[in-house]
Amino acid sequence: MAKYDFNNSTFSKLWDSVEGPRLLSVILTNPEMIRAYPTFWKQHFGIDPNITPTNADGTATFVSRVRELNDAYLMDMRAPLGDSIPEDKKGVSFYTGVIPDFIARGTVEQAMEREYKEQLFIENFGNDAQIVAQFVDDVQTKINAADMTLSNMAAQLMSKGFINYQAGLGIKGGILKAEIPAENFVKAGEKAWSDPEAQILTQMAQIEEEARERFGEIAMQWNIPYKMFHNVILKNKQVAELVQSYRTLNEKPIVSGMGITEEMFREAIVAFEGISPIVIVQEKQRDVVGMVSGWSENVAVLRPVGLAGLIRHTTILDQKMYEKYGATTIARAFAKTGNGLFTVMNTTLNNGNMKEWHTDLMMSAVPSLDEFPYHIIVDTSSANA
């Protein structure tokens, strides 16, 4: 027997159906090994603390509910001991959606690759840290793919009100549609915002004023894509005049011909009443066709401050079925990562006369828009007639 037994190494046992799940969990929940990047969906969505139950046919349907707020009015004057006048009650708005399944590109290791790693293990005197690090890098790539997928869907939902998944090489099509009221889809003012002469700030304030008349005094924020903010808003004539006026009144230097920076804009915008804080949206993903973005290019969003919704998730059907009915000749180890949203599966199976070792990452999750009655989508490319 070899002095250093590769089959008893940490790396080899990651595929063991008995010890593998525990070892995988230790690795996948270690922040020094698996990195958590500040992706788009994490900035705008939380994770539903409840797992959506799965029906007998494998379908997991979630319900997004929002209780509509009652408007506050001035109090009624009454005679002593007089009763109150009952107010009209508002109901609960809701919509449903089905949680889809996703899988990242898999890693397949064949016998010659495993043999090379065993020799590397022996040459390093039984130290498999380098081999485990390579495995972690492979899993990290899959986690990044899952994060990008959630971000793409989240950006679509926030800027379009629906998710139509066209990425990857698998199933394509519509996933869900939030029940955003028709009156929440608005256009630009007299001119499209791309026109330097457009009164962008005036239009933003007007949209907010109309929203507050409908919704009441709730804290709002603007979500504007990076390119629109820098290529449209910062080059707008009304914005330039506001910045120049602000800097002149506050005795701040103005360089002729110098463009407006984000810092200059944020200093000056406080002098323009009626516009909520602006959050710049940045999100891009890599797909088989190149770089893509889920956010609709010419859309700005006005919505309540805070998270836009939750990531709805359910259990992976693969784990349940394989643990109950899986072939005994195939070994599998499952573990969670990504705050429980993603499932890593290591599989050992036969391929002809040799074994193969597979690593896959799966996800049954989708973002839901949970402030949809108060979510306003502005098409800045279309002017009002």
Q: Model-flagged regions — what are they?
A:
Residues 1-54, 58, 368-385:
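N-terminal alpha-helical "arm" segments
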Residues 37-121:
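Assembly/oligomerization interface modules of large self-assembling protein complexes
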Residues 49-62, 86, 90, 124-125, ...:
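Intrinsically disordered, low-complexity coil segments
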Residues 53-58, 221-225, 280:
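A structural signal for short, well-ordered beta-strand segments and their strand-loop junctions
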Residues 100-181, 199, 203-204, 208-228, ...:
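Long, contiguous amphipathic alpha-helices that act as assembly "spine/axial" helices in icosahedral shell
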Residues 177, 182-194:
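Charged, low-complexity intrinsically disordered segments
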Residues 189-255:
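Charged, long alpha-helical assembly modules
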Residues 238-385:
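Sequence/fold signature of self-assembling virion shell proteins
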